[in-house]
Amino acid sequence: MTAFKPIKEGKVREIYDNGNSLIMVATDRISAFDVILKNKVTKKGTVLTQMSKFWFDYTRDLLPNHMLSVDVQDMPEFFRQPQFTGNSMMCRKLTMLPIECIVRGYITGSGWASYQKTGKVCGIQLPEGLQESQKLPEPIYTPSTKAEIGDHDENISYEQSIDVLEKQFPGHGLEYATKLRDYTIALYKKCAEYALSRGIIIADTKFEFGLDEDGNVVLGDEMLTPDSSRFWPLEGYEPGHSQPSFDKQFVRDWLKANPDSNYDLPQDVIDKTIAKYLEAYELLTGKKL
């Protein structure tokens, strides 16, 4: 059996080169505030992979994505070990575009903090009198640059995203920037409408895109997971304050309340976190993991 070593390790994912494809493994690591925490959250990697699979299948008619298979029987023997089952995805190789494509349908988090100070979110002027967690009249696209591990992503305007892409892909900056914006909003609208019918509000999320060998824009990375999105329960939703959530917000809140924790979570916080992830998966897909 040929052993594989990751060619790239992110905060949560490991990527392996499989010749003409990649194998992306979502680990049980958890990060918050750009730091990898000391604890592992059992089953988290499986939730991320299976949820991405669900959304990739759901949106394939809108645009192509990089997923080839989540069945380890389709992968080299090395990946048929227990630690890779359920949390591994074989993907097409893409040239990734250097923009995090963030879309916000509701005003919350850093967007809410910015709006209170300036009336704007990432330079976009919003109507007066919005409340925290309120639905925006239309989803807004607020791209950022991709930072290396340890650095913070930097919010940029749509116009700046044209320049960033033009530098790397001369002659294509405007074309790619426009496609990223339009795909991001179209994907969000389609999926947010579906999620609402299943009792979940998708407040915001981020997508990443790449180019295939023919220069087509293809959806990559992960899709609409509790790691990349804010999911709120529809039941009990009311603007005017922060909302309970199915995502990492629980972990962030605990860390903020316990600044001396040294990024070491107690077991009950870990248990509640995975329970939230599993609940979101079951509500959205109608399946149990």
Regions found by a protein language model. Give the residues of each.
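Active-site loop/lid in soluble adenylation, ligation, and acyl-transfer enzymes
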Residues: 1-148, 261-289
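Coil-to-beta-strand transition motifs
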Residues: 21, 96-98, 198-202, 214-217
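Intrinsically disordered, low-complexity acidic/polar segments
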Residues: 33, 112-113, 214, 228-230
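Generic recognition of stable, solvent-exposed alpha-helical segments in well-folded globular domains
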Residues: 46, 50, 175, 179-186, ...
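Conserved metal-phosphate-binding beta-hairpin within the catalytic cores
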Residues: 103, 202-223
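Anionic ligand-binding catalytic core segments
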Residues: 117-118, 126-175, 219, 223-284
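A long amphipathic alpha-helix within ATP-dependent nucleotide-binding catalytic cores
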Residues: 169-203
